[in-house]
UniProtKB/Swiss-Prot annotation:
Keywords from the named record: Cell membrane, Membrane, Transmembrane, Transmembrane helix
InterPro entries: Adenosylhomocyst_ase-like_sf, cNMP-bd_dom, cNMP-bd_dom_sf, Env_Response_Regulators, NAD(P)-bd_dom_sf, RmlC-like_jellyroll
Main localization of the protein described in the UniProt heading: membrane
Organism for this UniProt entry: Mycobacterium tuberculosis (strain CDC 1551 / Oshkosh)
Record bears the keyword Transmembrane: yes
Membrane-spanning segments: 146-166, 196-216, 330-350
Pfam families: cNMP_binding (PF00027)
Any one cellular-component term (Gene Ontology): plasma membrane
Name the record gives this protein: Uncharacterized protein MT0113
SUPFAM superfamilies (alphabetical): cAMP-binding domain-like (SSF51206), Formate/glycerate dehydrogenase catalytic domain-like (SSF52283), NAD(P)-binding Rossmann-fold domains (SSF51735)
Matches recorded under CDD domains: CAP_ED
Cysteines engaged in disulfide bonds, as pairs: none
Length: 504
């Protein structure tokens, strides 16, 4: 069996909350790796009974040694956790397995008893299945940890509330750069090396795609980012442009390069997924052009006369490479957010929750982030401005069309977006769109300038406002934090067309 790692952060977060999970049922769809097992063991120490836990994994992120260790603890692990049929799409296979797993687990764990059931999901499939099968009387709270999963369920009438870890500020601000670094490191370790002259396309300008671009641009002559959302960046006519790239990295969580574009790809192109499942490149269509390979981590060479491409990791995310541990100690942040969400879900009153998909409270997030910085990861390892744990935030709810500040005004606050969408305009032209987890306002505070852009809400939004003096005090005592802040500010100034010399 594989040894189980430990995360001091998760234990510290749980120890600081006076709650007990005795009698709670946990049904989960998760990566069956050391990270998840470590979190579950921490939950066992606050009363969760392993016999009340049922989990199902995904073929590309299930390690057999971890499965054995989980079963030795008394956890029920579904036999189809590592099932893989290469000529069938993963989502089709997985949904079928999850439907059976949930029906069997619900019947077995809830028969003859009244108990709170927490559904912990990665990808939205478990929550969607539960919503279709259960009636309104079920005592259920859901948790979703991925943006793709949140998108899958956000329009569904599930009949129970879902805690939205996926779009929490802490996850977006801190985890995305860490995952981007891991994806990049893993991808390039598994190739012979990519020349600096290679043209790279990243599909998806979300948190992961943007962080990947930041990592790759200093190393390569051409790194383009494609996103179909309005206002994200310079449009790319993908069908006409796709043949010009040597490497394509998918980070949309959806199908960014469908089968209809496969024969337009440049010969020898390298395809790597940085999202979830195998949907980024319609990978099943590429796998059907090859002899079936039962190893979902195989790098597949597709060369059938019409398509010449290498599909890394059979189209699955390259940061899952078959190892028992995905990432390093920095994964403690994600595990702590999930553990805190399980504790919250165990006692939350559904009728009193503010919305069907509430965010984990910013106070909880700040507590977790502060502990994360102190216990597990040096500040220098983070490439986003770490300010969620500072006291002094004021929560703002703004209507669509509301202007936070105007270009040329005096700068006196820093902002973090909890939910909604805002846009930044320079001379009346939209230059940037901002969503949950984004922060803004630091550039002018650091440079002692007036506002270089106007920022207004595109839809009803919730923000957290920090006074400029508190912002300055936080940076004054921490040289590493100050350096990160200046780096972010320089990027913002250049995006707005201002001179970097204004920072001096």
């Amino acid at each position: 069996m594989t040894p189980v790692t430990t995360f001091p952060l998760v234990d510290a977060i749980l120890a600081g909350r006076d709650r007990n999970l005795d009698g709670v049922i946990l049904i989960a769809a998760q990566h069956l790796l050391q990270t998840t097992h470590a979190m579950l063991r921490s939950l066992f120490r606050v009363g969760l009974d392993p016999r009340n836990v049922a989990v199902i994994g995904k073929c590309y992120s299930t390690h057999p040694g971890v499965v054995d260790a989980m079963r030795a603890d008394g956890i029920y692990v579904d036999d189809c956790s590592d099932a893989y049929a290469p000529h069938e799409s993963f989502d089709t296979q997985y949904t079928r397995h999850v439907e059976r797993f949930f029906a069997e687990s619900w019947a077995r764990l809830t028969a003859g008893r009244t108990a709170r059931v927490v559904l912990l999901d990665d990808g939205g499939s478990l929550l969607a299945v539960a919503g279709a099968m259960l009636d309104a009387s079920a005592d259920v709270i859901g948790i979703e940890q991925t943006s793709a999963g949140y998108a899958k369920i956000v329009g569904c009438a599930l009949g129970f509330p879902v805690i939205n870890i996926a779009r929490s500020s802490a996850k977006l601000l801190y985890e995305s750069p860490i995952i981007a670094a891991r994806v990049t490191q893993t991808a390039f370790e598994r190739t012979a090396g990519i020349d600096s002259s290679a043209a790279i396309l990243i599909t998806g300008a979300g948190a992961i795609g943007t962080a990947l671009a930041d990592v790759l641009r200093p190393l390569h002559d051409r790194v383009d980012v494609y996103d179909t959302r309005s206002g994200c960046m310079t449009p790319i006519d993908l069908p006409n442009a796709i043949g010009g790239y040597d490497v394509i990295i998918g980070a949309t969580g959806a199908t960014s390069v469908p089968a209809s574009m496969h024969e337009l790809l440049r010969p020898g192109v390298l395809l790597m997924s940085a999202s979830s499942s195998d949907r980024e490149f319609d990978a099943v269509a590429l796998r059907r052009r090859t002899t079936p390979n039962p190893d979902c981590h195989a790098d597949l060479r597709v060369a059938d006369g019409s398509v010449d491409a290498t599909l890394l990791n059979s189209g699955f995310p390259v940061n899952f490479d078959g190892s028992p541990m995905c990432g390093d100690a920095s994964m403690a942040l994600t595990m702590a957010l999930l553990a805190a969400a399980v504790l919250y879900a165990s006692v939350a009153v559904a009728d009193e929750m503010s919305s069907d998909h509430p965010h984990l409270g910013l106070i909880d997030q700040g507590d977790i982030v502060a502990s994360f910085l102190n216990i597990d990861v040096p500040l220098q390892a983070l490439s986003r401005l770490p300010l969620l744990s500072i006291d002094g935030y004021r929560r703002l709810q703004v209507r669509s069309g509301y202007t936070l500040f105007r270009q040329g005004e005096r700068a006196d606050h820093f902002f973090v977006i909890e939910s909604g969408e805002l846009e930044a305009l320079v001379d009346g032209k939209v230059i940037l769109r901002l969503g949950a987890g984004d922060h803004f306002g630091e550039a002018c505070l650091l440079g002692g300038m007036r506002r270089i852009a106007t920022v207004r809400a595109c839809e009803p939004s919730v923000l957290w406002e920090l006074d400029g003096k508190a912002f300055g005090d936080a940076l004054h005592g921490d040289a590493a934090m100050r350096e990160i802040a200046y780096g972010v500010a320089r990027t913002r100034l250049m995006h707005a067309g201002a001179s970097e010399s204004l920072m001096v």
